[in-house]
Swiss-Prot record:
DNA-dependent RNA polymerase catalyzes the transcription of DNA into RNA using the four ribonucleoside triphosphates as substrates. Gene3D superfamilies: 1.10.132.30, 1.10.150.390, 1.10.1790.20, 1.10.40.90, 2.40.40.20, 2.40.50.100, RNA polymerase II, clamp domain, RNA polymerase Rpb1, domain 3. This is DNA-directed RNA polymerase subunit beta'. One of its GO terms (cellular component) is DNA-directed RNA polymerase complex. It comes from Cronobacter sakazakii (strain ATCC BAA-894) (Enterobacter sakazakii). Its EC number is 2.7.7.6. It catalyses: RNA(n) + a ribonucleoside 5'-triphosphate = RNA(n+1) + diphosphate. Keywords: DNA-directed RNA polymerase, Magnesium, Metal-binding, Nucleotidyltransferase, Transcription, Transferase, Zinc. It comes from the Bacteria.
Length: 1407
């Protein structure tokens, strides 16, 4: 037996390899793979079912059909191994060689490989510098191509039609050489001198100035260099020998009834062989040219169809009218080789069943049905039975198990003990979708699942199924226990909060037992401790909610980690005292001394984890669950129709609203308001009414009046069941209660617009037919949305995983000083996310100073944990520069310091953690909770009134950043800068609120002044944009000619007149070139200069501007010279939810992006064209002016003569991330993408750590474009991996050479996935054909750095425990050690095996 094992070990020899190279196969190489030429199209003999000789299934070429048996049956058995039968020519060996032996077909005429021809950009076309159309005409025998011009005036690779060719033949005779078909193309490719061509192109590149030409030349140079470096020959793109796939990979299977099922490839091969043989015959017969030509064309088409059916012309179809599946189709798509068989395989030792609740299980257990366990652990049971001597052979053991003898169950118990199993629920959206549990054997057929892990699986018990997998090897069991056990996954990797959190019943139970009630039985008692409290409650002496005093002993950890006891009498309730019994030592009593809602319970577990660690938390979580269930059952909380209390005020509120609507209707009929205004007002009225009803309803539900001990009335929080469920966070929400007991409110039509008559009824009162009908639409839309959402969200996750899969933590510290500055997220008056939440678990990039001093508060490279964050908060620090993966300097992967804390474990991240995949899962998993729709601004959905002032909420001092302002005549400040920000700072120096202040706003308070809460600090007119003068003087009109550039309008009511500047479109011919402006002069008529510059103060007026001043009027600084009406922002759709996230990660340019200043300087306008104006920015320090054409309809934020900085907004709109990167740098674009993505998730209440989004951004910034190559081998304008530029520059600098300059590129995630260094990963993602073609031509090496590549080639992935294995391998190879080789040679092993087999299985074949 030992020898047998040795032999098997020797058989499965593992190849040690580090990279995989892909290249073009030369004809000789194809022949060297082949075991013989396939000459006939026959497959198998229809009578004998034996393969035909020289056919597609020929046994002589591909190997025997039966193990160790030749075709004619002369040689059978192992002893003849390796003999070649002289009768039928078949080698006697295993039949599995039919899976690996290839054949070949010698093509009678060369044929082009369709991938290199048609996969755009066409490689053959690029190499020959001929249009694809022309090449196709040559290949398919429509025209000739000149191969050798000789002494004639014909160029090489010139295309000739039939007539031109005949004329040339007459003229020059055989001076020149022209051919058609693939031979011609092959000859052209063969005669190319790649190096010389390359030199010539490089010279051309240096001379040319045209952008398009440069692009084309660089493309050709890259291709030619790829050919030179990879050792591929261009003529190999034309096939002369066609390889034939091994027959077992394109099987022919007999069905019952004498029919055969065959792979489509056989049909395709048959066509090729038939046409090839016919062509050979025609050539032997010297048939007329036209016939041969036709046959060659047909051969070319047959080969095309075999390689990639349907790529050119119509796809070849089989008998059933469906296109045949070609070789290319075999590997691409979801059903192709990559995604179906290499990335996702079915596994053995697995089962699935329905899940039910296991409320009595411990957190690390799951209930496994005995039937399933018996089947899954069969091999272990057989082994144990044999080991114990209970069964003599495996066969006997098998019989015992089938009979289910009593002893088998005992053995099963033993086998299962301490052997974890994996439970998985599809869809596995993040890594918590597969966790390990210890199985507990149960009766029945359903798997029992612990209720607390349902949140991680997103499982419920309405018929969900789960799969069970058994880790077999010791290593697998170890990993399952140490890494995947449910008890080790308490925190969510997405945000670091507990994910093992009680929900629903448990929350309700805990909430109920921690509530207090006035005048409950037993109120005012003083108890000796929690035990007495429980005794009183059990014996009925006191109610759960009674307010009592209890003696409580708390334990606190001191500096040495010892517990210190502290006992005191505390006011609490009986229920809370009982709950205290399960709280672990070391937590304060205050944690349970409050009504516990879902949030409070989550916080409680989190605190427990941070203070006490993993084990106590797990035990605590389990105990909370048992307690919660028990007390939920005792509470008797149920839902009855009387719990839905309808507010008494409802009828009168609705009546009032109806009266208001009637009034608006009258105004509309008398023509005072437009139809649109009426609609909007009606909807506003109803939205307000709905809010009032729901407020009245909640007030009503929230409190109830009770009599206290002294007989007085007192208000207390209600014990209404529905209210308790919503308040505790167990089930339901205020919005749902509103529909039950308030009014349903406004509904939307299918197109998203709001129906102006609301549903005034609620579900308790019931809906009438019309109301019900209006409601059905929304319900159906919800279902349709969900279905779409799931698919879209899944696709987003797939793209994210693909772009980030090769990002792994590879070193401890890269030593970079870079980082990104974190500030709290403040929108308007509220802090959306405090600084603490953003920097927790990050590493500081520089010393954090105490505000206002030079003292170091936190040193550089400190991991900010909870304690450090408390220090930051105490010192009211409001910006911290932290390390970030985006700025990490590691070449491949990132370093632990730049990543910071591993969110799921709570300590700094380990090397080898696959942070890319974790990030992708964390962003993708909540994708299904995001909305799918784009919101139309319409109705009450989201109509914010145009803001016209800033009102602060808190008291504090004002700070204005990047503000310019002037003082107007009444002494107020007027803002004259564009992107001014107003921050409110409280007395500790913390930023509380932040607002944008528009140009022309009048400030009531200035920078640094104190304000009280509720004070208005700035106001402006939202409908017009003013032009404000910065200097005082007299107005002088220039180019303001009545009737040409301006018109005078008089208001009928007031009699005031104003001038309106005409748009250039409305002007007469004479006024086209005039530039109306207001100039400011002093009393003597000299120009006044703008302070701090030598520019005269003159303000050019755009079209539609309104001037209310006359020529020569005196004005003071800060006055409004003119007003430009703002068109209200139109009703732009806000893209929200999932599509918005996808747009951000795909880095799509918005429709009308903001126009940003490319350089810093002074703005002026050049000559206008028909629809555009010319913006010129002249740098202050001289240098070339930058020009840009801007469409006239864009509203500009700058006036002529204004100074702008690089990256300033010139015209409003959504900013394009590419512009932000180009003009403001990596930090700014990171901040933009992170904040925008977070906005979408925050709206849905989903918490994701910023890190994850930064990880994806890092991958989007993977490429750089070379601006100037320096001494490197890069080409100018070439797009290369950023890490490669960094490494190259480091080497160049070390050798004192000129390094390359580059610009970072932002790629969308799909683009970035396809642009990865690894062609295996890219090919398995999308566009398989294109990726493989490109890689083959370039002769690419895949270094197998990422996860995906390694999964595909079947190695351990370089992450987690596989990371150590790969590091070890590298180390051993560097040290020159060889992997331990098997001690036994193959010859010895096979000999001993033969002996064994012949001895043991000699006579009896009839087992």
């Amino acid at each position: 037996m030992k020898d047998l094992l040795k032999f098997l070990k020797a058989q499965t020899k593992t190849e040690e390899f580090d990279a995989i190279k892909i290249a073009l196969a030369s004809p000789d190489m194809i022949r060297s793979w082949s075991f013989g030429e396939v000459k006939k199209p026959e497959t198998i003999n229809y009578r004998t079912f034996k393969p035909e000789r020289d056919g597609l299934f020929c046994a002589r070429i591909f190997g025997p059909v039966k193990d160790y048996e030749c075709l004619c049956g002369k040689y059978k058995r192992l002893k003849h191994r390796g003999v070649i039968c002289e009768k039928c020519g078949v080698e006697v060996t295993q039949t599995k060689v039919r899976r690996e032996r290839m054949g070949h077909i010698e093509l009678a005429s060369p044929t082009a490989h369709i991938w290199f021809l048609k996969s755009l950009p066409s490689r053959i076309g690029l190499l020959l510098d001929m249009p694809l159309r022309d090449i196709e005409r040559v290949l398919y025998f429509e025209s000739y191509v000149v191969i050798e011009g000789g002494m004639t005036n014909l160029e090489r690779s010139q295309i000739l039609t039939e007539e031109q060719y005949l004329d040339a033949l007459e003229e020059f005779g055989d001076e020149f050489d022209a051919k058609m078909g693939a031979e011609a193309i092959q000859a052209l490719l063969k005669s190319m001198d790649l190096e010389a061509e390359c030199e010539q192109l490089r010279e051309e590149l240096n001379e040319t100035n045209s952008e398009t030409k440069r692009k084309k030349l660089t493309k050709r140079i890259k291709l030619l260099e790829a050919f030179v470096q990879s050792g591929n020959k261009p003529e190999w793109m034309i096939l002369t020998v066609l390889p034939v796939l091994p027959p077992d990979l394109r099987p022919l299977v007999p069905l019952d009834g004498g029919r055969f099922a065959t792979s489509d490839l056989n049909d395709l091969y048959r066509r090729v062989i038939n046409r090839n043989n016919r062509l050979k015959r025609l050539l032997d017969l010297a048939a007329p040219d036209i016939i041969v030509r036709n046959e060659k064309r047909m051969l070319q088409e047959a080969v095309d169809a075999l390689l990639d059916n349907g790529r050119r012309g119509r796809a070849i179809t089989g008998s059933n009218k469906r296109p045949l599946k070609s070789l290319a189709d075999m590997i691409k798509g979801k059903q192709g080789r990559f995604r179906q068989n290499l990335l996702g395989k079915r596994v053995d030792y697995s089962g699935r069943s329905v899940i039910t609740v296991g409320p009595y299980l411990r957190l690390h257990q799951c209930g496994l049905p005995k039937k399933m366990a018996l089947e899954l652990f069969k091999p272990f049971i057989y082994g144990k039975l044999e080991l114990r001597g209970l069964a003599t052979t495996i066969k006997a053991a098998k019989k015992m198990v089938e009979r289910e003898e009593a002893v088998v169950w005992d053995i099963l118990d033993e086998v299962i003990r301490e052997h974890p199993v994996l439970l998985n629920r599809a869809p596995t959206l993040h890594r918590l979708g597969i966790q390990a549990f210890e199985p507990v054997l149960i009766e029945g057929k359903a798997i029992q699942l612990h209720p607390l892990v349902c949140a991680a699986y997103n499982a419920d018990f309405d018929g969900d199924q789960m799969a069970v997998h058994v880790p077999l090897t010791l290593e697998a069991q170890l990993e399952a226990r140490a890494l995947m056990m449910s008890t080790n996954n308490i925190l969510s990797p997405a945000n670091g909060e507990p994910i093992i959190v009680p929900s629903q019943d448990v929350v309700l139970g805990l909430y109920y037992m921690t509530r207090d009630k006035i005048n409950a039985k037993g109120e005012g008692m003083v108890l000796t401790g929690p035990k007495e409290a429980e005794r009183l409650y059990r014996s009925g002496q006191a109610e759960l909610h009674a307010r009592v005093k209890v003696r409580i002993t708390e334990y606190e950890k001191d500096a040495n980690g010892e517990f210190v006891a502290k006992t005191s009498l505390i006011d609490t309730t009986v229920g809370r005292a009982i709950l205290w019994m399960i709280v672990p030592k070391g937590l304060p009593f205050s944690i349970v001394n409050q009504p516990l809602g879902k949030k409070a319970i989550s916080k409680m577990l989190n605190t427990c984890y941070r203070i006490l660690g993993l084990k106590p938390t797990v035990i605590f979580a389990d105990q909370t669950m048992y307690t919660g269930f028990a007390y939920a059952a005792r509470s008797g909380a149920s839902v009855g129709i009387d719990d839905m209390v309808i507010p008494a005020k409802k009828a009168e509120i609705i009546a009032e609203a109806e009266a208001e609507v009637a009034e608006i209707q009258e105004q509309f009929q008398s023509g005072l308001v437009t139809a649109g205004e009426r609609y909007n007002k009606v909807i506003d009225i109803w939205a307000a009414a709905n809010d009032r009803v729901s407020k009245a309803m909640m007030d009503n539900l929230q409190t109830e009046t009770v009599i206290n001990r002294n007989g007085e009335e007192e208000q207390q929080v209600s014990f209404n069941s529905i209210y308790m469920m919503a308040d505790s966070g167990a089930r339901g929400s205020a919005a749902q209660i509103r529909q039950l007991a308030g009014m349903r409110g406004l509904m939307a039509k299918p197109d998203g617009s709001i129906i102006e008559t609301p549903i005034t009824a609620n579900f308790r009162e019931g809906l009438n037919v019309l109301q019900y009908f209006i409601s059905t639409h929304g319900a159906r839309k919800g279902l349709a949305d969900t279905a779409l959402k799931t698919a879209n969200s899944g696709y987003l996750t797939r793209r994210l995983v693909d772009v980030a899969q090769d990002l792994v933590v590879t070193e401890d510290d890269c030593g970079t000083l870079e980082g990104i500055t974190m500030t709290p997220v403040i929108e308007g008056g509220d802090v959306k996310e405090p600084l603490r939440d953003r920097v927790l678990g990050r590493v500081t990039a520089e010393d954090v100073l105490k505000p206002g001093t030079a003292d170091i508060l936190v040193a550089r490279n400190t991991l900010l944990n909870e304690q450090w964050c408390d220090i930051l908060e105490a010192n009211s620090v409001d910006s911290v520069k932290v390390r970030s993966v985006v700025t990490c300097d590691t070449d491949f992967g990132v370093c632990a310091h730049c990543y910071g804390r591993d969110l799921a474990r709570g300590h700094i991240i380990n090397k080898g953690e696959a942070i890319g995949v974790i990030a992708a899962q964390s962003i993708g998993e909540p994708g299904t909770q995001l909305t799918m729709r784009t919101f139309h601004i319409g109705g009450a959905a989201s109509r914010a009134a145009a803001e016209s002032s800033i009102q602060v909420k808190n008291k504090g001092s004002i700070r204005l950043s990047n503000a310019k302002s002037v003082v107007n005549s009444s002494g107020k400040l007027v803002v004259t800068s564009r992107n001014t920000e107003l921050k409110l700072i409280d007395e500790f120096g913390r930023t509380k609120e932040s607002y944008k202040v528009p140009y022309g706003a009048v400030m009531a308070k200035g920078d640094g002044e104190q304000v009280a809460g509720g004070e208005t600090v700035a106001n402006w007119d939202p409908h017009t944009m003013p032009v404000i003068t910065e200097v005082a003087g007299y107005i002088r009109f220039t180019d303001m000619i009545d009737g040409q550039t301006i018109t005078r309008q008089t208001d009928e009511l007031t009699g005031l007149s104003s001038l309106v500047v005409l748009d250039s479109a409305e002007r007469t011919a004479g006024g086209k070139d005039l530039r109306p402006a207001l100039k400011i002069v002093d009393a003597n008529g000299n120009d006044v200069l703008i302070p701090g510059t030598d520019m005269p103060a003159q303000y050019f007026l755009p079209g539609k501007a309104i001037v209310q001043l006359e020529d020569g009027v005196q004005i003071s600084s800060g006055d409004t010279l003119a007003r430009i009406p703002q068109e209200s922002g139109g009703t732009k759709d806000i893209t929200g939810g999932l599509p918005r996230v996808a747009d951000l990660f795909e880095a799509r340019r918005p429709k009308e992006p903001a126009i940003l200043a490319e350089v810093a300087g002074i703005v002026s306008f050049g000559k206008e064209t028909k629809g555009k104006r010319r913006l010129v920015i002249t740098p202050v320090d001289g240098g070339d002016a930058y020009e840009e054409m801007i469409p006239k309809w864009r509203q500009l934020n700058v006036f002529e003569g204004e100074r702008v900085e690089r990256g300033d907004v010139i015209s409003d709109g959504p900013e394009a991330p590419h512009d932000i990167l180009r003009l403001r740098g990596v930090q700014a674009v990171t901040r933009y993408i992170v904040n925008e993505v977070q906005d979408v998730y925050r709206l849905q209440g989903v918490k994701i750590n910023d890190k994850h989004i930064e990880v994806i951004v890092r991958q989007m910034l993977r490429k750089a474009t070379i601006m100037d190559a320096g001494s490197s081998e890069f080409l100018e304008g070439e797009q290369v991996e950023y890490s490669r530029v960094k490494i190259a520059n480091r080497e160049l600098e070390a050798n004192g050479k000129v390094s390359a300059t580059y610009m970072r590129d932002l790629l969308g995630i799909t683009k970035a996935s396809l642009a990865t260094e690894s062609f295996i990963s890219a090919a398995s993602f999308q566009e398989t054909t294109r990726v493989l073609t490109e890689a083959a031509v370039a002769g690419k090496r895949d270094e197998l750095r990422g996860l995906k590549e390694n999964v595909i080639v079947g190695r351990l992935i370089p992450a987690g425990t596989g990371y150590a294995y790969h590091q070890d391998r590298m180390r051993r190879r560097a040290a020159g050690e060889l992997p331990a080789a098997p001690q036994v040679t193959a010859e010895d092993a096979s000999a001993s095996l033969a002996e064994l087999l012949n001895a043991g299985l000699g006579g009896n074949d009839n087992e």
